[in-house]
């Protein structure tokens, strides 16, 4: 691949079954570590099969205060429950240091912040969420406040002034309430949960709760698309790093299906070229892209 080709990922022209025929919804709580650790699965699925599906994060965080009205747990219509599995989730304890009970009003504020960021676009919301999770789980921020949320907005390269206006806006509140309602309609009882729907069909959706092997997600996607689908080649390593900006050796190794040793050899070459900075955090090695950001698609 030449230098110019390595800068961008060009999706091929869609065929009859490549029109984003599947809609995926990932139900998360931003303060739950399992919801952070599923992200490499989603990134890999998107890189290989992103032309077949769209994905949206649904925030399931707790509402603020004891007077907030609760939704009834309705039996979801038109959804097939496939698997449910207990993961390493214990309450909302993250890394043994970040606990929900330590931050009674945090879930509402954090959820509103994610919705405020999403008002600038789905991609902006995803960038903000990833940056927020880095603060929470890598720097042990147990009680994200407005100052930290503004820092996340700045680090995510979204419009900070717009974010400030939207943080307590009716639009962000309505978006969060819609997420809560959808969570209840889908009868989400475990996070993370992933729900797939065929965009152009009245057929039932598929829900998978917990975290499974990557092949399971591919299998479900193929079942819904209902035609032969092949994975796209993964992008060059530099393209992934430009897009994510900050990623661990473990995540990169998973995405490329290589050993950490192999991946770190390549990453150290980029370090010598002064394209990445190596950062050791909590017995895990992370890599920060130094050059200007470029998107995957």
Swiss-Prot record:
Signal peptide: none annotated. Keywords: Cytoplasm. InterPro entries: Adapter_SpxH (IPR046404), Thioredoxin-like_sf (IPR036249). It is found in: Cytoplasm. It comes from the Bacteria. GO terms for cellular component: cytoplasm. Pfam families: Thioredoxin_5. Belongs to the SpxH family. Adapter protein required for efficient degradation of Spx by ClpXP under non-stress conditions. Interaction with Spx stabilizes Spx and exposes the C-terminus of Spx for recognition and proteolysis by ClpXP. PANTHER family: CLPXP ADAPTER PROTEIN SPXH, GLUTATHIONE S-TRANSFERASE KAPPA. Interacts with Spx. This is ClpXP adapter protein SpxH. It comes from Bacillus thuringiensis subsp. konkukian (strain 97-27). The lineage of its organism: Bacteria, Bacillati, Bacillota, Bacilli, Bacillales.
